């Protein structure tokens, strides 16, 4: 067996099928991706309610915003990132829409002062929080917290429905390619492949298709069937427990601060400098621990500063307590020697 931590999910199958996330969510619509979900939600609002302007937080996955550019709606950024306590400066008028983000499952903008704007909350990093806030709508990607190749969702209001979205051939083919990548990664971790080159090639080719509007589709039916086998609540609960365990193992240091204490997404470190972040990241990769940076390619200076200091370390349900302790110990050992 090859021991690697982080990066993309390998294929996982479960017969438990006990998720309340799907069974107890009225008006939940499944899409190929999170960006397809928000695209179709905005499209619905434009045609049905006359939405004119939408605001996205400046610190965000900008590929999602670009996917929505062709819609007949003005798109703006409002200043906000999860380490800045920015007040929301927004034109609170009828016909305006504000997208808020539950960042890493730990922080989101306070929109209590907004009385007229429609609020849409992105719960990608905290799937089980859907419906818990006063937002008008919820959407997200499923593939950040769950081992599934494609998937997004949108929760509408009662009696609202999408009428013109279907499954596309490109969405189906991309799902199949992503599945091949996940199967190949499983083989790689079992030491049945000489290298990770093949599965990485399939992953990268599939990921490129997410930017293509030909994947503006409902969730492929095969993906829905796979999703229904996953014990979603169990996965996220285990991830929370692992992250809490990892945090308890970390020794205090002035080199970084932990941004999250209770979430089901990942361990989020905010490093003192970009140099510390980059050096720690390289050290972890050298030890087969592959952290993520959320999100690259920021536009505004404050957001670039955060992008350059943040590190997201996976301690999810894939890993045992012993493996989580190993990851935390590696972080500790790095700072012992600097």
Task: Indicate where each model-derived feature is located.
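N-terminal "arm"/small-domain region of PLP-dependent enzymes with the aminotransferase-like
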Residues: 1-23, 193, 197-217
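Conserved PLP-binding active-site segment in aminotransferase class I/II-type PLP enzymes
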Residues: 1-50, 92-93, 226, 231-237, ...
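Conserved PLP-anchoring active-site segment centered on the Schiff-base-forming lysine
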Residues: 43-92
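Active-site phosphate-binding strand-loop segment of PLP-dependent enzymes
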Residues: 80-164, 173
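Conserved glycine-rich beta-strand-loop-beta hairpin in the small C-terminal domain of fold type I
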Residues: 214-247, 256-270
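Conserved PLP-binding catalytic core of the aspartate aminotransferase-like
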Residues: 254-301
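PLP-dependent enzyme catalytic core of the Aspartate aminotransferase-like
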Residues: 286, 298-338
């Amino acid at each position: 067996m090859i021991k690697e931590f982080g990066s993309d999910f390998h294929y996982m199958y479960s017969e438990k099928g006990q998720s309340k996330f799907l069974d107890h969510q009225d008006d939940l619509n499944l899409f190929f991706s999170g960006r397809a979900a928000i695209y179709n939600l905005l499209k619905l609002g434009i045609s049905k309610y006359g939405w004119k302007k939408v605001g996205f937080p400046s610190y965000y996955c900008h590929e999602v915003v670009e996917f929505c550019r062709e819609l007949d709606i003005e798109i703006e950024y409002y200043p906000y990132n999860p380490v800045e306590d920015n007040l929301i400066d927004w034109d609170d008028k009828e016909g305006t829409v504000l997208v808020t983000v539950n960042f890493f499952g730990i922080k989101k903008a306070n929109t209590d002062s907004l009385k007229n704007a429609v609020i849409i909350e992105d719960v990608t990093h905290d799937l089980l929080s859907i419906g818990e806030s006063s937002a008008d709508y919820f959407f997200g990607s499923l593939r950040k917290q769950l081992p599934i190749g494609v998937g997004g969702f949108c929760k509408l209001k009662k009696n609202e429905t999408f009428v013109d979205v279907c499954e596309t051939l490109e969405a189906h083919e991309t799902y199949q390619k992503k599945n091949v990548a996940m199967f190949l990664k499983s083989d790689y971790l079992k030491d049945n492949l000489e290298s990770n080159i093949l599965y990485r090639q399939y992953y990268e080719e599939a990921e490129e298709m997410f930017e293509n509007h030909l994947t503006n589709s409902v969730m492929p039916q095969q993906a829905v069937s796979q999703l229904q086998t996953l014990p979603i609540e169990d996965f996220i609960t285990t991830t929370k427990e692992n992250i809490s365990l990892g945090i308890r193992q970390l020794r205090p240091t002035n080199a970084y601060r932990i941004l999250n204490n209770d979430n089901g997404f990942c361990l989020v470190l905010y490093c003192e400098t970009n140099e510390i972040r980059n050096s720690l990241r390289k050290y972890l990769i050298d030890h087969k621990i592959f952290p993520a940076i959320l999100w690259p390619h920021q536009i505004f200076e404050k957001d670039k500063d955060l992008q350059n200091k943040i590190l997201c370390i996976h301690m999810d349900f894939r890993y045992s307590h012993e493996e989580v302790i190993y990851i935390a110990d590696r972080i500790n050992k790095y700072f012992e020697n600097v």
